[in-house]
Swiss-Prot record:
GO CC field: chloroplast
InterPro entries on file: Domain_X, Maturase_MatK, Maturase_MatK_N
Single Gene Ontology MF annotation: RNA binding
Signal peptide span: none
Cell compartments where the protein resides: Plastid, Chloroplast
Lineage: Eukaryota, Viridiplantae, Streptophyta, Embryophyta, Tracheophyta
Biological processes per GO annotation: mRNA processing; RNA splicing; tRNA processing
Record carries keyword tRNA processing: yes
Pfam (any one): Intron_maturas2
Protein name: Maturase K
Length: 507
């Protein structure tokens, strides 16, 4: 956000109306590609000097206007491979510039709205990510029904452009945006829409994330409007940003986080009748009342998608399930409400009778199969969960190899410490421990049995067997038995997001 304000040097009132000239600014593409703004990325690729970069951008857009949009036949496709390759480069460059330019008015609108509402000075509408699971523990035990709805996508390109025009009043810019989207769609017209979205998200991730999250924000704004019209009760809305672990840092960098990536934002609201959570392309509705209210909101969603966004959604694809019988995936867990039944014998005078009590408890399950798939993708095991060596790490020292495996193992244990059943984590520890041993044996060109026999299996990797309560006793040597007993039950650690970074960084 600060970089945009420094390099644009435009008045805030004019930035919303004149975006088209920004497409021809070189520093826009420097911001998009992360290059040094004093160097020309076009000069590096094409061979021109810095003064020619503006002409190259104009030339790219001119070629898009003059390009023939007819489908190339199969015989001509081999002859025009160089032209199609250049067109992919042009669309890639311009899409990166679009992603930066189109984020500017929305980030400025967000910052101005926050300043007017003085949200940054209050703690009511901004909560830490660590309050999500206590919220589920307190609220979901009193709820009965849940609907896990997949937000339909992709949306038609023309509808998406028309929605954007409500926010940005720049006709030339949207002519160019429409031309670019249809140009990219026509160049990939031989594949299905789902595969087109997949290729577009991989080749233009920043632009795709913006378009998708803008569509989600538009859909949720209408959904909030319908909710406010249907109920006179006050709505409490919260937003959680995953990029910042500490609460004060998130308050400080609120505008910057939203301007960069909307996809990592989780939004939810609650009222006495219905709870709504949107996470990873899904809308989760939960209610305590009978399914009548859930059915009403289900048809609200269907008519909203069909009438406003021209997206076909059938009522049979949206299911309303009991929380006690259905679990849903959220933040790496499987969550449902478990019913604990107990029978109490009561006696009054000479009459004795039995009382059946039902206690609801939030059951948080470790998804063992998705975890094994993630470990298999990171080459710690095969698809069946059998540990394998990681030859990529064989060049490191023994201490670094053990430290990497221990970091992943401990962070997984920390993250899933709040789960109800921790026995499934023993298999994950076994996979990581044996994968570490096989990696060390591969490095020393020995078998696993000979390597353990030479170094001693008891002293090697003994850190894998240190339980969480032992770690607490090491950190707090004077901890009482009450603290250790609480630790055995359920504790949500403050570093619950670190393990995913380790898995990604050490692949």
């Amino acid at each position: 956000m600060e970089e945009h304000q420094v390099y644009l040097e435009l008045d805030r009132s004019r930035q919303q109306d004149f975006l088209y000239p920004l497409v021809f600014r070189e520093y826009i593409y420097g911001l998009a590609y992360g290059h040094d703004l004093n160097r020309s990325i076009f000069a590096e690729n094409v061979g021109y000097d810095n003064k020619s970069s503006l002409l190259i951008v104009k030339r790219l857009i001119t070629r898009m206007y003059q390009q023939n949009h007819l489908i190339i036949s199969a015989n001509d496709s081999k002859k025009n491979t160089f032209l199609r390759y250049n067109n992919n480069i042009y669309s890639q460059i311009i899409s990166e510039g679009f992603a930066v330019v189109v984020e500017i008015p929305f980030s400025l609108q967000l910052s101005s709205s926050l300043e007017e509402a003085e949200i940054l000075k209050s703690y009511n509408n901004l909560q830490s990510i660590h309050s999500i699971f206590p919220f589920f523990e307190d609220k979901f035990t009193y709820l009965n029904y849940l609907s896990d709805i997949r937000i339909p996508y992709p949306i038609h390109l023309e509808i998406l452009v028309q929605i954007l025009r409500y926010w940005v009043k720049d006709v030339p810019f949207f002519h160019l945006l429409r031309l670019f989207l249809y140009d990219y769609c026509n160049s990939n017209s031989l594949i299905t829409p789902k595969k087109w979205i997949s290729t577009f998200s991989k080749s233009n991730p920043r632009f795709f994330f913006f378009l998708y999250n803008f569509y989600v924000c538009e859909y949720e704004s209408i959904f909030y409007f319908l909710r406010n019209k249907s109920s006179h009760l006050r709505l409490k809305s919260f937003s959680v940003f995953f990029e910042r672990i500490f609460f004060y840092a998130k308050r400080k960098h609120l505008v910057e986080v939203v301007a960069k990536d909307f996809l990592s934002t989780l939004t939810f609201f609650k009222d006495p009748f219905i709870h709504y959570v949107r996470y990873q392309g899904k809308s989760i509705l939960a209610s305590k009342n009978a399914p009548l209210l859930m059915n009403k909101w289900k048809y609200y969603f269907i008519h909203l998608w069909q009438c406003h966004f021209d997206l076909w959604a059938q009522p049979g694809t949206i299911h309303i399930n009991l929380l006690s019988e259905h679990s849903f995936h959220f933040l790496g867990y499987f969550l449902n409400v478990r019913l604990n039944r107990s029978v109490v014998r009561s006696q009054m005078l000479q009459n004795a009778f039995l009382i059946e009590m039902v206690i609801k408890k939030l059951d948080i399950i470790v998804p063992i199969i998705p975890l094994i798939r993630s470990l298999a993708k990171a080459n710690f095991c095969n698809g069946l969960g059998n540990p394998i060596s990681k030859p990529v790490w064989a060049d490191s020292s023994d201490f670094d190899i053990i430290d990497r495996f221990l970091r992943i193992c401990r962070n997984l244990s920390h993250y899933y410490n709040g789960s109800s059943k921790k026995k499934s984590l023993y298999r994950i520890k076994y996979i990581l421990r044996l994968s570490c041993i096989k990696t060390l044996a591969c490095k020393h060109k020995s078998t696993v049995r000979a390597f353990l026999k030479r170094l001693g299996s008891e002293k090697l990797l003994e850190e894998f067997f240190i339980e969480e309560q032992e770690i607490v006793s090491l950190i707090f040597p004077r901890a009482s038995x009450t603290l250790q007993r609480l630790h055995r039950n359920r504790i949500w650690y403050l570093d619950i997001l670190f393990f995913s970074n380790d898995l990604v960084n050490h692949e």
